[in-house]
């Protein structure tokens, strides 16, 4: 691999690493948190989060209890598990995605909610970024804007492309967002087909349908569902030799053709952990601004490109922060 540029800190003012020390904790107290997500407990996101908490002095089985029931869920389980977490008196609930956030908000009006989602303000989950109000704060990852940017990059990655597809989580994407992608594609003379999924077992069929529709490239739109099934998508795209671009740069390091966005590990290890620690220390969520990523990375995988018979334009290679040979 070669780094084309030095990766800058992901969030303005966020610290990349902290000393291993306790910070404003009550001696002898154990803190209890609970997730509400499609992601499994061993996903890179949670591994990064727990590492960030450890760096801040919050260590599982020492002074931190992580309720096990909220990992690896299906959407229809969110409401029941949210109610269980409230009954268990967790001190913070950590939902991922709009549906999980709404379930947590409906379950409690008092327990702090630290969330990560595509567009928390646009979805009506908070009242403002600077002053979110209520019990919910967290990270809004600019998904709508980044989905459009990834579509643009995908078109530039495939010389002469005339037709592309988008893999869509039907639980999260609004019609207006998808219309904007279609308008942007048509403005460049590109035909865009949409392939919706609501459950993991629909993903392979949707990717197959995209290729059958004549798509020469696939834009994997941001969503908790598609993020949790990233390896499945990478593997299916490889079998079909279908170039695809993903929400997180790490996807290209795992065998995908391209990834563009903020670093998943840094979002969770640095910013999510920092905000969670503040909530555990007693800061009110209404007073904790919702954060947005400010630094993004393009990673390209030349090995994957070669297996797909794709020659990436030199101009694209020059733009990438990292190229995997």
Ranges and model annotations:
Residues 1-325:
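Short hydrophobic alpha-helices and adjacent helix-cap/hinge residues
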């Amino acid at each position: 691999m070669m780094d084309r540029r030095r990766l800058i800190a992901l969030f303005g003012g966020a610290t990349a690493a902290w000393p291993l020390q306790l910070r404003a904790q009550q001696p002898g107290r154990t803190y209890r948190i609970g997730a509400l997500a499609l992601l499994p407990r061993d996903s890179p996101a949670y591994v990064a989060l727990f590492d960030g908490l450890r760096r801040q002095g919050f260590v599982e089985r020492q002074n931190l209890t992580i309720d096990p029931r909220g990992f690896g869920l299906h959407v229809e389980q969110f409401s029941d598990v949210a109610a269980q977490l409230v009954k268990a008196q967790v001190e913070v609930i950590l939902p991922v995605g709009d549906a999980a956030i709404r379930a947590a908000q409906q379950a409690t009006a008092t327990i702090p909610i630290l969330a990560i989602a595509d567009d928390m303000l646009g979805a009506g989950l908070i009242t403002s970024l600077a002053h979110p109000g209520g019990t919910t704060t967290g990270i809004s990852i600019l998904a709508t804007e980044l989905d459009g940017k990834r579509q643009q990059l995908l078109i530039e990655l495939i010389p002469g492309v005339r037709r592309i597809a988008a893999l869509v989580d039907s639980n999260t994407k609004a019609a207006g967002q998808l219309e904007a992608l279609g308008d942007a594609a048509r403005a460049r003379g590109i035909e865009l087909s949409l392939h919706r999924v609501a459950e993991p077992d629909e993903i392979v069929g949707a990717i197959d349908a995209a290729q059958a529709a004549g798509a020469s490239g696939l834009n994997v739109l941001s969503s908790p569902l598609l993020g949790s099934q990233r390896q499945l998508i990478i593997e299916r795209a490889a079998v079909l030799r279908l170039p695809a671009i993903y929400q997180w740069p790490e996807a290209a390091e795992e065998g995908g053709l391209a990834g563009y966005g903020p670093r998943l590990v840094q979002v969770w290890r640095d910013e999510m952990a920092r905000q969670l620690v503040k909530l555990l220390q007693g800061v009110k969520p209404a007073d904790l601004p919702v954060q947005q990523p400010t630094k993004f990375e393009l990673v390209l995988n030349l090995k994957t490109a070669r297996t797909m018979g794709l020659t990436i334009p030199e101009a694209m290679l020059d733009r990438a922060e990292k190229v995997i040979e």
